[in-house]
Design a protein with these regions (language model features):
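Beta1-alpha1 glycine-rich phosphate/pyrophosphate-binding loop at the start
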Residues: 3-57, 143, 148-174
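FAD-site-proximal beta/loop scaffold in flavoenzymes
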Residues: 122-138, 228-278, 286
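A conserved FAD-binding loop/helix module that cradles the flavin
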Residues: 18, 154-156, 267-297
Length: 297
């Protein structure tokens, strides 16, 4: 079957795009690997009317609603290669199936490169976090930490200090300059130079951070700014232009989420440096409606 649109990725951006194309009565094939970025988090915050909801439950509900449209079909799998051009795209899946369509929406998301610190990975998305607007309120006025991972970490520490007492762990990163230290001090941010050895606490909670010099520092949340990578190389295969941001690559899009390749749209975390469920949904709506209109006009 030659679909009107192929969507690679069935998380918040992809499902939003599928919804609007389906409501435009277009045939849509959604290809999803089933590994959304925020699957590690127990709660999602800041999204209209869904504050505190479990992200996987949100996606399950959204998928069921999209599946109610007769023109949408879902395939569990991974897109491994692509070819063609506008009106004649072909995507090969890891099952060797070839899916064909007139338009292509990329919404396959990103993955995070976490520091190799014992106790960190299992707390990612819960007490090890990256976005204060998504998770910060729940840790208000508690013991907060920021791990120095990039030049942006100083800015992150300045911001996080708005939510509570903050310690900047220089760890093994580059030491900030005198001006940055002065600004951190002005904001009341404590500086800790000893490298981090491990995180400790019950379950997904943090109670303290262990340093290489043997000290245990009380802590309730650790903010990190991990590098990330695109979950698929499909955009490179088609020659979509990229932007190199401090924490990873993103696919270039215009205001309608159109890439530099005719007929290919992109949405969600793969197109922006700032990430949230709300932005991903908005991107998906924009890409879905733009793809639909390109089929009409």
């Amino acid at each position: 079957m030659h679909h009107d649109a192929i969507i690679i990725g069935g998380s918040f951006a992809g499902l939003s795009a599928a919804t609007y194309l389906a409501r435009g009565r277009r045939s849509v094939r959604v290809i999803d690997a089933g590994k959304p970025r925020n699957r590690f988090a127990e709660h999602s915050h800041g999204f209209f009317a869904q504050d505190g909801s479990n992200p996987l439950s949100m996606l399950e509900t959204a998928k069921a609603q999209v599946e109610a449209y007769p023109t949408v079909t879902f395939t569990q799998g991974k897109a491994v290669s692509g070819s063609g051009e506008i009106d004649n795209f072909a995507i090969e899946l890891d099952s060797s199936e070839i899916v064909e369509g007139r338009r292509l929406i990329l919404a396959f998301g990103i993955s995070d490169e976490l520091p190799d610190i014992p106790g960190l990975a299992e707390r990612w998305g819960n007490s090890v976090i990256h976005c204060p607007y998504c998770h910060g309120y729940e840790f208000s006025d508690r013991q907060l930490g920021v791990l120095n991972m990039s030049p942006m970490s100083v800015h992150q520490a300045m911001l996080i200090s708005e939510w509570g007492s903050t310690t900047f762990f220089i760890d093994k990163g580059l030491e900030p300059d005198a001006e940055a230290f002065a600004e951190l001090e002005r904001r009341g941010v404590k500086i800790e130079r000893s490298p981090v050895r491990a995180l400790h606490g019950e379950g997904i909670d943090i109670s303290e951070i262990e340093l290489e010099d043997g000290r245990l520092v009380p802590l309730n949340a650790l903010y990190i700014g991990p590098r990330n990578w695109l979950n698929s190389q499909i955009a490179d295969t088609f020659g979509c232009a990229m932007d190199e941001l401090p924490l990873g690559r993103t696919i270039q899009t215009d205001g309608l989420k159109t890439t530099t390749v005719p007929g290919i749209f992109a949405a969600g975390d793969i197109t922006r440096g700032a990430h949230s469920v709300a932005w991903s949904v908005a991107d998906g709506v924009t890409a879905g409606t733009a793809a639909h209109r390109s089929l009409v006009f």
